[in-house]
Regions:
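RNA-contacting regions in translation and RNA-metabolism proteins
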Residues: 1-143, 147-168
């Protein structure tokens, strides 16, 4: 049976006691301490969901009321939605599961779904920095109501660039 690969040892995550190697990864910032409960929930889900038995765990982000998990593998939309639903019920908060490795636009489409992305532009500022502008139809603003800043911070964290979301 194949299992999802995690950056920390399974025993450390399940027990909550980190070995020196895992402790180093947490202290260096490679893995955030907030990711450990999310990894634990995913490991528990592997026993119930056969969809979750392959692939790699990349990263997760906890925004208080919502969790965003990035996985790498060959899952379809239905499987990702099923994983997200089960993870939501285990963690007691909303969860989104995204696939990594399909490009910036695809990652943003998954994150901002059901909002449609009209385009992504790069804006070079006079100080030499870059800003990505994500253009979304005005009619889809309702899907991001109250979450614009959260998604902007999330995308900025992943890409290492300043992000602006505009509605046209």
């Amino acid at each position: 049976m194949f299992l999802v690969k995690y950056p920390l040892d399974r025993i450390c995550v399940k027990s909550g006691v980190l070995c020196p190697n895992c402790q180093r990864k947490v202290e260096s910032g490679e893995v955030a301490r907030e990711e450990i409960p999310i990894m634990k929930a995913l490991m528990e889900l592997e026993e119930d969901l056969k969809e979750l038995r392959t692939g790699n765990y990349i990263k997760s982000f906890d925004f208080g009321d919502e969790v965003i998990v990035i996985l790498k593998g060959d899952w379809d939309k239905v499987s990702l939605d099923k994983i997200a639903k089960e993870l939501s019920s285990r963690l007691g908060k909303s969860a989104k599961v995204l696939l990594e490795g399909e490009g910036v636009k695809k990652l943003m489409e998954q994150l901002l779904y059901p909002a449609t992305i009209l385009g992504i532009n790069t804006l070079w500022l006079p100080d030499g920095s870059e800003q990505m502008v994500v253009r979304i139809p005005r009619r889809d603003r309702k899907y991001l109501k109250g979450k614009e800043e959260k998604y902007r911070r999330f995308i900025s964290t992943i890409l290492g660039k300043d992000i602006k979301i505009t509605f046209e």
